[in-house]
From Swiss-Prot:
Repressor in keyword set: no
UniProt name for this protein: 3-ketoacyl-CoA thiolase
E.C. number: 2.3.1.16
Enzyme class at the top of the EC tree: transferase
Recorded superkingdom: Bacteria
Reaction equation(s) it catalyzes: an acyl-CoA + acetyl-CoA = a 3-oxoacyl-CoA + CoA
GO terms assigned for molecular function: acetyl-CoA C-acyltransferase activity
Protein family according to the UniProt entry: Belongs to the thiolase-like superfamily. Thiolase family.
Active site: residue positions: 95, 346, 376
N-terminal signal peptide: none
GO biological process: fatty acid beta-oxidation; phenylacetate catabolic process
Keyword Acyltransferase recorded: yes
Gene of this entry: fadA
Keywords annotated in UniProt: Acyltransferase, Cytoplasm, Fatty acid metabolism, Lipid degradation, Lipid metabolism, Transferase
Taxonomic placement: Bacteria, Pseudomonadati, Pseudomonadota, Gammaproteobacteria, Moraxellales
Amino acid sequence: MTILSPKDVVIVDGVRSAMGKTKNGMFRHVRADSMSAELVRALVERNDFDPRDVEDIIWGCVNQTLEQGLNIGRNIGLLAGIPKTAGGQTINRLCGSSMQALHTAAAQIMTGQGDVFIIGGVEHMGHVGMMHGVDLNPEASKHYAKASNMMGLTAEMLGRMNNITREEQDAFGLESHRRAWAATTEGRFDNEIIGIEGHDEAGRLQLCTVDEVIRPDATMEQMQKLRPAFDPVGGTVTAATSSALSDGASAMLIMSAQKAKELGLKPRARIRSMAIAGCDAAIMGYGPVPATQKALKRAGMSIDDMQTIELNEAFAAQGLSVLKALNLTDKQDIVNINGGAIALGHPLGCSGARITVTLLNAMEQSDTEIGLATMCIGLGQGIATIIERV
């Protein structure tokens, strides 16, 4: 039995939307801020606490413009009916934005700057494209390879460096879809997905509760027919072994252990350690390796202590390279057991909290105690969180 100290940071609950296709998907008529507000309301409804206790709403979002602009974190709180006394901020660490939101809230709790936080993230890549309004400095090419801005080519680089074959990537991608669909049909996502109204292909209103990007009918034969998506001459990375562009949001209720006890709320897990790390931008997908190593050191653990792992699948070549570097190639039965971003999609600002929520549910379903959530970040970073069930 884990004994909690008053300032331990605990996860009380976590939710997410289903993941929608970016192109003509089920959330094509739903705004990013509206989708996020639904999740915040769900956290309040699912947990018996006074929202006046919320110190801050911290939201991850990458492209902060259009409907995602003007501090979407604050707008979400107002839309959700959270008392105006709570603050709201928006964080950007690219793909790691909502995990950084978790880390920021945790650090504030640890240092006595609040006890109750709602964190999360969103990206509506159908409404706000990944490169919308982006103007990169031409001088950046003096400091890192120009192709470092092209995520698919960084995956190709990692694949070549680690001798990851096309066949291995196709098998990895196919398994992601298989696991995700099995988790869907067996109800393993039911506790984390909050139904949000969207539209079907014909435009009819529907409650969206199933991830739209999963391909339950995917076969190896289909995947092998696809051409390389980023390097047409010698490439091995295809659309089927890349995380899908998608629309989605995630949210978590975080507080100090002392506050949870006062409110009579049962924590589901505590945060054992957190870390970020940088690496060469040309191999940005390697970032989870140094970030995980830092987090393990801070927790006084080794990779062998991790019982369940969520590794964001930016690309199969990237995921397999990270597994190889962390000596997890032969332990893929504990990694992304409910599928990953290749099958579920990767709405940039959403994914960090999403994989942490999925990790927590997977740990409860598998009855494991220690888990790791980690992900790569564009331009050469990684982020990692180790949690322990309580």
